[in-house]
Regions:
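Short beta->alpha transition motifs characteristic of CBS
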Residues: 125-128, 185-189
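Single conserved hydrophobic/aromatic residue that forms the stacking wall/gate
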Residues: 1-11
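Glycine-rich phosphate/pyrophosphate-binding beta-alpha loops
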Residues: 186-200
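Short glycine-rich anion-binding loops that position phosphate/pyrophosphate groups of nucleotides
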Residues: 66-68, 112, 188
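Internal nucleotide-binding/catalytic subdomain
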Residues: 78-170, 174-176
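A charged helix-plus-loop insertion that forms the helical arch/lid used to bind
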Residues: 12-16, 190
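A conserved helix-loop-beta module that forms one wall/lid of the active-site cleft
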Residues: 16-76, 81
Length: 200
């Protein structure tokens, strides 16, 4: 009813709430990124323990609930199939299994899109975690020019393809071989982007 009334009154909702159907569901988010030729870690949808055995080539990996979960909640690090015995996992919801990367560092980037061709892109932020909790962030991130340009290019592409008007944050991984991956999209400044309040 609310959406119908908004259309009748010509009210534009920004950011578009439909975006949440993509970015708050990990499997949908990864598929969206793949369709736009944006590199992610290898992944598969998991609905039961047999699926993990089927995709054992993704181990060692991280098993994550497709929805909800943050700061390590709803996530299980699996070294191998035997490691399943060390966790109490209830397969009453959908998961995704992501292959671990040989991580060198994590960065994030805040972008605000006002309209077509009207952007404000902040410098990449370097993040350090302890036990899957963000400890601190520094800006600018200590990264090479290629990663700097590619992270901004992908963040801009994501906001365009989502037709996003507002502020979002894209989280990236850089592995030891200097490959760049998008880990997740947050439809807000993200905890790593709070420094933009006072740093600019």
């Amino acid at each position: 009813y609310l959406h119908r009334r908004q259309r009748q009154m010509c009210i534009r909702d920004s950011p578009n709430p439909e975006v949440n159907k993509i970015v708050q569901h990990r499997y949908s988010e990864k598929n969206f990124l793949g369709k736009n030729n944006i590199r992610t870690t290898k992944f598969e949808k998991i609905v039961n323990e047999n699926d993990i055995k089927k995709y054992r080539d993704l181990l060692p990996g991280i098993l994550k609930t497709s929805t909800l979960g943050y700061d390590g909640k709803g996530q299980y690090k699996l070294k191998d199939l035997e490691d399943l015995n060390n966790h109490e996992i209830r397969f009453d919801k959908e998961f995704i299994l992501e292959k671990l990367v040989n991580l060198e560092k994590e960065i994030s980037l805040v972008i605000t899109r006002f309209s077509k061709d009207n952007y404000e892109i902040y410098e990449p932020i370097e993040n350090l975690h302890e036990e899957q909790i963000l400890k601190y962030s520094t800006i600018p991130a200590q990264i090479n020019l290629s990663h700097f340009k590619k992270s901004q290019e992908w963040a801009k592409l994501i906001s365009e393809e989502l037709q996003y008007v507002g502020t979002l944050c894209v989280e990236f991984f850089i592995d030891k071989d200097q490959n760049l991956y998008v880990n997740e999209i947050a439809p807000r400044v993200h905890n790593s982007g709070h420094l933009t309040i006072n740093a600019y």
